[in-house]
């Protein structure tokens, strides 16, 4: 059973509830919706089997998108905290929220605790590439990190891809401003030899221009750089389609070309749409926690829950707990 924060996100609770119902209709999995009960019930519009698989737990407090984590963690009657408690107590196998990222992360660390050996939990998110997808870690959880943190990110990411995606030896690259060893700032220069020595599958530095070529399965970065990469990629993809619409597919000739290319363009747009991936796991806490985009609508919620189910069923958490995260151990 999974638990969902019904009040998190720009379009909560309506789009969250609709996405949950779509997921339940498709999979038959049980879901607990946590939030203001009266508001949730107003959105439970679908009939059929989904209603029998959805439980509601009331939570009077709401963590807003602008709220500071230090304030959010004090709200013990919020949908975030109550949902995480269900995971801690073993009632639910995973927690999903499209709410305030910082608040969810801080609450998860406080409520669930960190896995032994992990100093900084990190967000790992898929990015589309020419050959499929690559995974970026950290996508925004940690602005300031040390080399040992980046090492731990790489280890966690490899465990995730090996278990949830059955990639036997994931290729790991370190994001830098040049491919050669010795390029980068002080953090990158100190991290490179650690990954080179201790990470099987480490292929060296990767430049920004190669992220979407599919040369690596995992790209390691601090959360400041990683989040900029993520948001830049999202913005660029959206801008390209706006440009095509405004500058290319106009007039009779452009409209005809758009009609001919419609199927191909829809496939490309689908691959670039964050809603197709749905959510990103927070690795390093003692439980399965997925954080979705604040703009998530029903499609993103449904898909995010599907990925979270896959992660739970893979046994990822048990394997991560076995991991050796001590960078200084001989």
Curated annotation (Swiss-Prot):
EC number(s) from the headed UniProt entry: 2.3.1.274
Record has Lipid metabolism as a keyword: yes
Pathway participation: Lipid metabolism; phospholipid metabolism
Keyword Membrane: no
Cellular component per GO, a single term: cytoplasm
Catalytic activity reported: a fatty acyl-[ACP] + phosphate = an acyl phosphate + holo-[ACP]
Listed GO MF terms: phosphate:acyl-[acyl carrier protein] acyltransferase activity
Keywords annotated in UniProt: Cytoplasm, Lipid biosynthesis, Lipid metabolism, Phospholipid biosynthesis, Phospholipid metabolism, Transferase
SUPFAM superfamilies: Isocitrate/Isopropylmalate dehydrogenase-like
InterPro entries in alphabetical order: FA_synthesis, Phospholipid_synth_PlsX-like
Principal location listed in the UniProt entry: cytoplasm
GO BP, one annotated term: fatty acid biosynthetic process
Subcellular location: Cytoplasm
Assembly mode: Homodimer. Probably interacts with PlsY.
PANTHER family, sorted: FATTY ACID/PHOSPHOLIPID SYNTHESIS PROTEIN PLSX, PHOSPHATE ACYLTRANSFERASE
NCBIfam families on file: plsX
Family: Belongs to the PlsX family.
Its job: Catalyzes the reversible formation of acyl-phosphate (acyl-PO(4)) from acyl-[acyl-carrier-protein] (acyl-ACP). This enzyme utilizes acyl-ACP as fatty acyl donor, but not acyl-CoA.
Protein name: Phosphate acyltransferase
